[in-house]
Amino acid sequence: MTLPKILDVIQMDDSSLSEEIIAIKRQLFDLRLKRATRQDFKPHLFKHSKHRLAQLLTVEKSRAQSN
């Protein structure tokens, strides 16, 4: 699984961008919960989720500064 590209994020509208940020934060929380309770989880999903969240927040902040 490759890391997501920022071009996909740039093409999103503001509402879907906000929804995606919330979904990724929830996914990271679930991964941390699984790790803490020693359930099966895929550790590489931490990297992918954090990378995606950083992309989303970067685009959101740049749009807020340009407006």
Curated annotation (Swiss-Prot):
Q: Share an example GO biological-process annotation for this protein.
A: translation
Family matches, as PROSITE patterns: RIBOSOMAL_L29
TM ranges: none
Q: Does the keyword Ribosomal protein apply?
A: yes
Q: What is its main location?
A: plastid
A Pfam family found in this protein is: Ribosomal_L29
Q: Which CDD domains match?
A: Ribosomal_L29_HIP (cd00427)
Query: What InterPro entries does the record point to?
Result: Ribosomal_protein_uL29, Ribosomal_uL29, Ribosomal_uL29_CS, Ribosomal_uL29_sf
Q: Name one GO cellular component term.
A: cytosolic large ribosomal subunit
State the compartments where it is located.
Answer: Plastid, Chloroplast
Which keywords, in A-to-Z order, does the entry hold? Chloroplast, Plastid, Ribonucleoprotein, Ribosomal protein
One MF term in the entry's GO annotations: structural constituent of ribosome
Sections of the chain in a coiled coil? none
PANTHER family on file: 60S RIBOSOMAL PROTEIN L35/50S RIBOSOMAL PROTEIN L29, LARGE RIBOSOMAL SUBUNIT PROTEIN UL29C
The UniProt similarity line reads:
Belongs to the universal ribosomal protein uL29 family.
The name on file for this protein is Large ribosomal subunit protein uL29c
Task: State the species of origin.
Answer: Porphyra purpurea
Gene that this sequence comes from: rpl29
